[in-house]
Amino acid sequence: VLPALLEYISAYPDIHINCVFVDRVVNLLEEGIDAGIRIGELPDSSMRALRVGKVNQVICGSPAYLNAKGIPRTPNDLEKHTLIRSAGVSPTHSWRFSEGITIKIKPRLVINSNDSVVSALKAGLGLGRLISYQVAPELADGSLKKVLSSYEPSHMPVHIIHREGRSG
């Protein structure tokens, strides 16, 4: 998001932006925010939405963790693993997979910061599910490895939402 935002304010020098980055869903009206980015299907609301892309979720862990605990071959294998969950955006106790598979998870660690989840995964504390861009550098440098790729759920839409009467 930040690179696009920097490009935008460079192109429009009279625009002033107060940017808030948080790992949770905010109420734009209550918090006085003009626009936000939402990942996933949108509930009905009074907000206007513009679809701008799509992302996918991945489950990953460190090579050291996978060497010690083994690589899960199916979603059901996750019950034998230590799981780390991000609390911010998706406070759910179930993970959905392709082919309509849903499993209940019992995370050992729940963290409200995606960056901290990445740190815990790199430290070898367990497996976690994040959005692919949140772990792209770690997947590229090999400090994290994806598992259960063939079970990844469908891509999730990305929207810019804003209050009625506001435009970007």
Roles of regions detected by a PLM:
Residues 18-22, 147, 161:
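Solvent-exposed beta-strand sheet faces enriched in polar/charged residues
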Residues 1-45:
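Central regulatory/effector-binding core of bacterial HTH transcription factors
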Residues 11-14, 141, 166:
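Conserved amphipathic alpha-helical interaction elements at protein-protein interfaces in regulatory
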